[in-house]
Amino acid sequence: MERATRPGSQAGMTLVEILVSLTIFAIVIGALTTILFSSTRLGTRTASRADIQGACRQTMSLMSTEIRQAGADPRIPPIGVVGVVYADSVTLRTRGDISGDGVIQTTEPSEDVTYSYVDSTGTLQRNPGTGAVNVLENITGLRFAYYDATNALITPVPLSATNAALVRSVGITITGRQGDAEPFTISSRIMLRNR
């Protein structure tokens, strides 16, 4: 049986139908593109945050190890090592006779180490006595705080030689930020073993 067609009817789409279809298609493509770019930006921010977190944690681990050894003086009789040589809110210099040879080494592994925050470059520097080296970049803040045997905060900074001799623990707070990622802050309290 043959299908009856109306006179004047033509198979196909009208221009209005094509324009409506293209408009819907453009809206869907636009939404998908927006989602793709948002996901990419989120992934980049997440990766940046993970990078700065890892770098801050690694640096905190290094600092903890070296600061914990401040004042090491295993010789008998002791040579009188001064553990905390200089201390203010952004700089800390420590010494310890880690090797037990009676001499404070300034070559790696150094027994006289200075950590300092350089605000103008956003870096944390480590100076083992042979020159400062950046150990952490992209930081927006670093603070040292010093505590005595009763956990009381020692002030004012920089600490006098008398107050530096009272230091039993050091609080460290590092804030880092990379790119447009959210800032990351890590804090630690390090007990000096040799006090």
Q: Which residue ranges define each predicted feature?
A:
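Residues that act as N-cap/strand-start positions at coil-to-secondary-structure junctions
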Residues: P78, T107-E111, F184
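Short, glycine/small-hydrophobic-rich surface segments
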Residues: T44, D51-G54, I67-I98
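Extracytoplasmic low-complexity repetitive segments enriched in small/polar residues
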Residues: Q58, L62-I76, G102-V103, P109, ...
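Short linear sequence signals and composition-biased patches located at protein termini or domain-edge surfaces
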Residues: E2-T5, R41, D51, R68, ...
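A generic fold-level signal
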Residues: Q10, A55, Y86-A87, V167, ...
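Aliphatic-rich helix starts adjacent to a transmembrane/signal segment
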Residues: E2-Q69
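Type IV pilin-like appendage domain
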Residues: G83-P156
